[in-house]
């Protein structure tokens, strides 16, 4: 009831015990506000069902004041709803301690309270709790945490960038990989790892409006991140005073935000830890003028600690535009365009020297002199060793140069030339006659590029006169699909109406099973369509996608792509091919392009193929060429002299070749080496694949499902269907769907079946289930019969699980150093600890369940003996706890000191290292060591064993 809560009272959260002791701040209507001073968190609960337990101590309990002194309670007084404790301090002096002054770090022995209250859990739950602790501990210490759970093939350069960036405090970097190398995945990995580690809690993602859906799909499908998509309608309809404050991850279209000052004010007021901006190269900047979009992002970058900019490659942008992105990251470091140009020229000969070392294995006198001039006297010994053929010295030399690279810590840029694993492409053009029905269509935007849309727009026609009855591209498509029978074919067209009509055409005219995929469908409907296409045995041969509908999707299990029409921009063309042409594609991409002869379609095909070479290769110059030649291109597409057209194509080809030559000579191999990770990323790939092959997760999840009443049944090979049973223990179990869900632990299966949940240790279902076990009391008491002939019947053993717990903000990541692994002791009647001689699994195999009533009866009869032994258990385990805490402090200090030394040394030769980064690391070291000093032992679980 509402009146039981008073400001100043101390309560503990039933679901988030790690927050420490809570203080009631306010009771407002139906809401209760609680502050947790230990972590700085504030929570609001419904008054009717707040998951809180009142903190009351009894005479005999020892409690701690927030200044550190202890009080043994003699008497408890209730004054206006607030507890006041009277007793003796450590010097046996009488003291009074109001509950408002209790230490925020006090722990509770809830397991013993439940045991003596008769709340005894099933035996299997105790094992589940122990295993949950062990798995949680292992994952928190893993170098793969936040990297291995992505629904994607692990790729070395992506993992290297993600770890390098996500492990920084408030990273401020530019991701400028070439198209097809997965910048969005890199950004998602950084976001995911920062969220899991606690380095970031609130993330703002700014994207162009046409990419909102792609980001929504990518973040949800690949990382299970629930992103809130904001637009004008959602913002206006929200009842909240600031709609952005309710979203941990917000996805916002930059176009809307620039035009809505009220939304801008709310966005700034909401507070964010990490800003991610996609397509950052579209932010226009000149020395004397900036665009509204650039100005807005600049303001946000000044108040948000972490900034991630995704952009085209620096070579595509030009140096001035590249400088504009770097200004957003660090305006103090990049403040003068002329100085930046000079610095870039300074690094060019060094990069060329490194290229020579990599290609030739040795340095010419000129390259030797260049590097010596760059490194100074300290480089002499290294260069001498390189000259003697020392390969380790070569690697060290390259590392030294990387550390000194002007933008090496803020810019990551991988190229297809430097990354292996891309497929080849083959082009199959099909010129077809233009039907009479398309000759005199009304003019419209690109009407002759998409004549079927213009034809349909004229009005209703009889079924036998629909465009797909006479368009030769449809006849060609049916024949091609029959020729490629049992081969998966992806068909992409510009418009959703065309996609739906093509599905009708295939069904009516051929009976070929097809699935359709367009922006008018919900995400769930698209998932089902994609799954039907992906199914090898019973699925559709063909998936027909609209332009927008296919954004962000990956169909690399197919390698035949039909472009039923051509898009109006080369970036969209590359996006289409990119649905199949990705790292990991095992086959040559077959591009099938039907087009109508003597029409704008034919000329557009020639423009892309002969002018831009955009079919057979990626086209990094496509955007620049389209911009440069656009005024000549558009009129000539619709008509015009053949000679003028041929001249345009020839001019575009010459300009493309010139730009490509510039790109090649301007390649910065030093930067590519740094971005690729030089072997570190490959080690992460191998570790993730090794983790994928282990059975620990499926075995653990079966016990978790069993405990919570989740039924699992086979769906197909490597896949299970999960459904809530009638005996489901907790409705809050994060199943994801009340009706049930299909899961797989197999990465390959998950990549081809997007309708299945891909379960890893990072998945919300796994993490949520583990949290339910550990945050509540599940399995923290048990009584069992032990069958062992070496034990005299009636012998009582007491198994205690303790956890070394530190209450601290997640951003300190103290779980990496002091994870919640179980400290176990097994006490006999004489108080001897047998745990080192009897392993948990060995003991488990000898146990049998005891009826709850009998178990409770035994516990009550032995209460005094058990209570004494429980209190003695803490003394037994205390040395192990102190050792773990000391080791955690040593590890934290060693890691922080090593990183500090590296950054300080690096700052001396590379101004990209910010003072704020070094200061933040120093503070994190100090705060972490101070928090570890307060680590306390918590009794996690008790199991009473009776020999029989």
From Swiss-Prot:
Give start and end of each Helicase C-terminal domain.
473-627
Q: Which residues form a coiled coil?
A: none
Indicate the segments forming the Helicase ATP-binding domain, all copies.
164-332
Indicate which residues the UniProt annotation says bind ATP.
177-184
Name of one Pfam family that matches: Tudor_RapA
Q: Which GO terms describe its biological process?
A: regulation of DNA-templated transcription
Q: Which GO terms describe its molecular function?
A: ATP binding; DNA binding; helicase activity; hydrolase activity, acting on acid anhydrides
State the Gene3D superfamilies in the record.
Answer: 2.30.30.140, 2.30.30.930, 3.30.360.80, 6.10.140.1500, 6.10.140.2230, P-loop containing nucleotide triphosphate hydrolases (3.40.50.300), Tandem AAA-ATPase domain (3.40.50.10810)
Keyword DNA-binding annotated: yes
Check the record and name the InterPro entries matching this protein.
Helicase_ATP-bd (IPR014001), Helicase_C-like (IPR001650), Helicase_RapA (IPR023949), P-loop_NTPase (IPR027417), RapA_C (IPR022737), SNF2-like_sf (IPR038718), SNF2/RAD54-like_C (IPR049730), SNF2_N (IPR000330)
Q: Which SMART domains match?
A: DEXDc, HELICc
Q: Where does motif DEAH box map?
A: 278-281
The entry's keywords: Activator, ATP-binding, DNA-binding, Helicase, Hydrolase, Nucleotide-binding, Transcription, Transcription regulation
- The protein's Enzyme Commission number: 3.6.4.-
Quaternary state and interactors: Interacts with the RNAP. Has a higher affinity for the core RNAP than for the holoenzyme. Its ATPase activity is stimulated by binding to RNAP.
Q: What does this protein do?
A: Transcription regulator that activates transcription by stimulating RNA polymerase (RNAP) recycling in case of stress conditions such as supercoiled DNA or high salt concentrations. Probably acts by releasing the RNAP, when it is trapped or immobilized on tightly supercoiled DNA. Does not activate transcription on linear DNA. Probably not involved in DNA repair.
Which family does this protein fall into?
Belongs to the SNF2/RAD54 helicase family. RapA subfamily.
Q: Which PANTHER family match?
A: DNA ANNEALING HELICASE AND ENDONUCLEASE ZRANB3 FAMILY MEMBER, SWI_SNF-RELATED MATRIX-ASSOCIATED ACTIN-DEPENDENT REGULATOR OF CHROMATIN SUBFAMILY A-LIKE PROTEIN 1
Identify this protein by name: RNA polymerase-associated protein RapA
Species assigned in the record: Pseudomonas putida (strain ATCC 47054 / DSM 6125 / CFBP 8728 / NCIMB 11950 / KT2440)
């Amino acid at each position: 009831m509402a009146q039981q809560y008073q400001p100043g009272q101390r309560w503990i959260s039933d679901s988030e015990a790690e927050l420490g002791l809570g203080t009631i701040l306010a009771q407002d209507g139906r809401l209760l506000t609680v502050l947790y001073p230990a972590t700085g968190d504030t929570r609001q609960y419904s008054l009717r069902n707040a998951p809180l337990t009142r903190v009351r101590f009894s005479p005999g309990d020892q409690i701690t004041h927030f200044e550190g002194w202890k009080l043994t309670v003699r008497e408890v007084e209730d004054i206006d709803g607030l507890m006041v404790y009277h007793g003796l301090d450590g010097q046996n002096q009488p003291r009074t301690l109001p509950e408002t002054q209790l230490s925020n770090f006090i722990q509770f022995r809830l397991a013993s309270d439940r045991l003596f209250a008769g709340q005894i859990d099933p035996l299997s739950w105790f094992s589940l709790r122990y295993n949950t602790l062990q798995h949680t501990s292992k994952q928190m210490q893993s170098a793969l945490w936040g990297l291995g759970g992505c629904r994607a093939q692990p790729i070395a350069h992506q993992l290297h960038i993600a770890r390098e960036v996500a492990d920084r405090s408030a990273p401020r970097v530019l991701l400028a990989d070439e198209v097809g190398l997965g910048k969005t995945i890199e950004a998602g990995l950084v976001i995911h790892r920062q969220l899991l580690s606690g380095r970031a809690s609130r993330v703002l993602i700014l994207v162009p409006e046409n990419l909102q859906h792609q980001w929504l799909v990518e973040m949800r499908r690949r990382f299970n991140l629930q992103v809130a998509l904001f637009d004008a309608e959602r913002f206006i309809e929200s009842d909240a005073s600031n709609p952005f404050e309710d979203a941990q991850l917000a996805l916002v279209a930059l176009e809307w935000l620039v035009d809505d000052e009220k939304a801008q004010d709310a966005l700034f007021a909401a507070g964010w830890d990490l800003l991610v901006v996609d397509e950052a190269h579209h932010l226009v900047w000149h020395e004397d003028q900036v665009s509204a979009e650039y100005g807005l992002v600049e303001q946000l970058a000044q108040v948000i600690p972490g900034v991630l900019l995704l952009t085209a490659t620096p070579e595509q942008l030009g140096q001035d535009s590249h400088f504009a992105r770097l200004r957003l990251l660090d305006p103090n470091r990049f403040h003068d365009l002329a100085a930046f140009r000079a610095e870039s020229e300074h690094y060019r000969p060094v990069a060329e020297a490194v290229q020579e070392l990599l290609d030739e294995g040795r340095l010419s006198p000129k390259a030797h002199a260049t590097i010596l001039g760059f490194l100074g006297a300290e480089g002499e010994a290294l260069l001498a060793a390189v000259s003697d053929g020392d390969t380790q010295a070569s690697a060290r030399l390259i590392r030294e140069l990387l550390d000194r690279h002007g933008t090496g810590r803020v810019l990551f840029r991988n190229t297809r030339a430097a990354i292996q694993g891309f497929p080849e492409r083959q082009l199959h053009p099909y010129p077809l006659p233009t039907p009479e029905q398309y000759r005199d269509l009304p003019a419209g935007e690109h009407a002759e590029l998409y004549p079927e849309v213009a034809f349909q727009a004229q009005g209703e026609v009889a079924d036998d006169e629909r465009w797909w009855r006479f368009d030769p591209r449809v006849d060609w498509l049916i024949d091609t699909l029959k020729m490629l029978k049992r081969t998966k074919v992806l068909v992409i067209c510009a418009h959703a109406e065309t996609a739906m009509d093509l599905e009708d055409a295939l069904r009516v005219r051929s009976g070929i099973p097809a699935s359709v995929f367009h922006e008018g469908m919900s995400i769930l409907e698209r998932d089902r369509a994609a799954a039907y296409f992906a199914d090898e045995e019973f699925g559709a041969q063909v998936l027909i996608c609209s332009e927008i509908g296919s954004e962000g999707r990956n169909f690399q299990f197919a390698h035949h792509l039909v472009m039923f029409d051509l898009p109006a921009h080369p970036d969209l063309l590359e996006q289409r091919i990119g649905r199949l042409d990705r790292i990991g594609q095992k086959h040559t991409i077959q591009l099938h392009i039907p087009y109508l002869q003597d029409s704008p379609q034919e000329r557009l095909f020639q423009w892309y193929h002969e002018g831009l070479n955009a079919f057979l290769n990626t086209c990094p110059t496509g955007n620049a060429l389209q911009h440069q030649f656009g005024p000549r291109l558009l009129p000539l597409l619709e008509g015009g002299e053949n000679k003028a057209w041929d001249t345009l194509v020839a001019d575009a080809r010459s300009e493309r070749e010139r730009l490509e030559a510039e790109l090649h000579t301007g390649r910065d191999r030093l930067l590519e080496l740094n971005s690729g990770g030089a072997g570190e990323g490959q080690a992460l790939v191998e570790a993730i694949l090794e983790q994928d092959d282990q059975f620990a997760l499926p075995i653990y999840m079966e016990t978790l499902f069993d405990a919570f009443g989740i039924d699992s049944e086979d769906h197909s090979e490597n896949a299970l269907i999960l459904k809530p049973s009638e005996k489901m223990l907790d409705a809050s179990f994060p199943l994801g769907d009340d009706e049930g869900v299909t899961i797989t632990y197999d990465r390959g299966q998950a990549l081809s079946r997007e309708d299945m949940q891909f379960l890893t240790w990072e998945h919300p279902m796994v993490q949520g289930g583990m949290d339910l076990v550990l945050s509540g009391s599940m399995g923290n008491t048990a009584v069992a019969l032990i069958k062992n002939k070496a034990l005299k019947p009636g012998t009582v053993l007491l198994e205690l699980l303790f956890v070394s717990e530190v209450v601290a903000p997640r951003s300190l990541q103290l779980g990496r150093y002091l994870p919640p692994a179980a400290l176990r002791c097994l006490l006999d009647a004489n108080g001897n600890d047998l745990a080192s001689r009897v392993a948990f699994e060995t003991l488990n195999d000898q146990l049998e369940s005891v009826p709850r009533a009998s178990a409770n009866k035994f516990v009550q009869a032995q209460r005094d003996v058990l209570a004494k032994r429980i209190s003695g258990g803490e003394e037994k385990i205390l040395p192990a706890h102190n050792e773990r805490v000391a080791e955690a402090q040593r590890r934290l200090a060693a890691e922080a000191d090593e990183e500090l030394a590296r950054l300080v040394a690096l700052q001396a030769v590379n101004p990209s290292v910010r003072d704020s980064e070094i200061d933040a690391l120093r503070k994190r070291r100090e705060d972490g060591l101070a928090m570890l000093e307060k680590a306390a032992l918590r009794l996690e679980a008790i199991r009473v064993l009776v020999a029989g």
